[in-house]
């Protein structure tokens, strides 16, 4: 996991400041001003440091930014000829590039999704106030598109928890010890996620001011499935579970726009698609390679004690737990999103020198689709 210093240097400048932007070439400071409500025009106004003139640039994996207004969380959204303020959906027309022209100036460019060569910049319609922001293909020698940061306020990022070693397998202390229901939990990774991509009862406008970045924490532990004392040479059938419940899958998708694929990789929706690389890197997960979602499956498995003495066996499966937190550490989803991965199982035993039980027939008896 990246520590805070690394995160601070890893996130581009776009993600670390609250900005007031003005057009550099104007005779008077023309600051970009978002409407009070979504679905309105982005305008230029006299710089007044109103809440509508403060913006956060949320960076994506490919270097583009999502420009969100601090007042209500609405974002720059491209239309046919101009840019408006709208609710964030993950549309390609909500991703802009900040192109540096000089040390002090840059322009905001957007690419036409239907044409790789059609790159347009934002330009005021006129030098009269107020003025709408329009697109122009006149970029090369056009000083009217240049923007500078009239003011930048440093954005405090959440402190992420430190990574820990992978969870240790529980050890049984005696023939009557069934072991813990769960092993000690280990933090595997954590990642920042913009507030516009998550679901919370706090209004989006309030989130932009108090917790513009949330974080997702990935924890792992060993979950007990069963425990039994096997007489010498005995065979027993045990019930085990794998996957994730439908309730948790839906809740996770609603909460962070991420779900878990059938191969235990992460599947990203439109809102989070632009940060999937950084998200999986930081949380020590992978992007799914399947279109199928993970479901909960129940198995029966036969185990045989091949020893000539009684052995206590306790079966464990690796659990991956995801939780969403505000910048102050408060957990948003009171019930964690948990997936049990039966590709990673272990059996604790006592006496410790006993061999593992012999695995026999395995049968799927139920899943979420039946």
UniProtKB/Swiss-Prot annotation:
UniProt name for this protein: Binary larvicide subunit BinA
Xref: Pfam families: Toxin_10
Subcellular location field: Spore, Perispore
PTM entry text: Processed by proteases in the mosquito gut, probably at both the N- and C-termini.
Organism: Lysinibacillus sphaericus (Bacillus sphaericus)
GO molecular-function term, one example from the UniProt record: toxin activity
Record region (Pore-forming domain): 156-370
Keyword entries, A-Z: Disulfide bond, Sporulation, Toxin, Virulence
């Amino acid at each position: 996991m990246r520590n805070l210093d690394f995160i601070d240097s890893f996130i581009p400048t776009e993600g670390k400041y609250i900005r007031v932007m003005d057009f550099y070439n104007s005779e008077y400071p023309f600051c970009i001003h978002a409407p009070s409500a979504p679905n309105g025009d982005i305008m230029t106004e006299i710089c007044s440091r109103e809440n509508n003139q403060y913006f956060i640039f949320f960076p994506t994996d490919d270097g583009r930014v999502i420009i969100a207004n601090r007042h209500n969380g609405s974002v720059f959204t491209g239309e046919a000829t101009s840019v408006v303020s709208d609710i964030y959906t993950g549309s390609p027309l909500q991703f802009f590039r900040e192109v540096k022209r000089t040390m002090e100036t840059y322009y905001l460019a957007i690419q036409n999704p239907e044409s790789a060569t059609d790159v347009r910049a934002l330009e005021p319609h006129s030098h009269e106030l107020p003025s709408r922001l329009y697109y122009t293909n006149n970029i090369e020698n056009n000083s009217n598109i240049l923007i500078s940061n009239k003011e930048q306020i440093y954005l405090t990022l959440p402190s992420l928890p430190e990574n820990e070693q992978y969870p240790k397998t529980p050890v049984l202390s005696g023939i009557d010890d069934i072991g813990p229901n769960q092993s000690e939990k280990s933090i595997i990774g954590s990642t920042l996620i913009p507030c516009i991509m998550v679901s919370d009862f706090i209004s989006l406008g309030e989130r932009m001011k108090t917790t513009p970045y949330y974080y997702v924490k990935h924890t792992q532990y060993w979950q007990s499935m069963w425990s039994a004392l096997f007489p010498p040479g005995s065979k027993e059938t045990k019930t085990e579970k794998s996957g994730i419940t439908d309730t948790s899958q839906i809740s996770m998708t609603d909460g962070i726009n991420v779900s878990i694929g059938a191969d235990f990789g992460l599947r990203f929706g439109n809102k989070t698609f632009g940060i999937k690389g950084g998200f999986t890197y930081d949380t020590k997960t992978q992007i799914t390679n399947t279109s199928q979602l993970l479901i909960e499956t129940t198995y029966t498995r036969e185990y045989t004690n091949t020893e000539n003495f009684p052995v206590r066996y306790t079966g464990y499966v690796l659990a991956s737990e995801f939780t969403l937190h505000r910048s102050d550490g408060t957990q948003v989803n009171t019930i964690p999103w948990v997936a049990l991965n039966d590709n990673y199982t272990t059996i604790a035993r006592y006496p410790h020198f006993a061999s593992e039980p012999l695995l026999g027939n395995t049968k799927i008896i139920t899943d979420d689709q039946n």
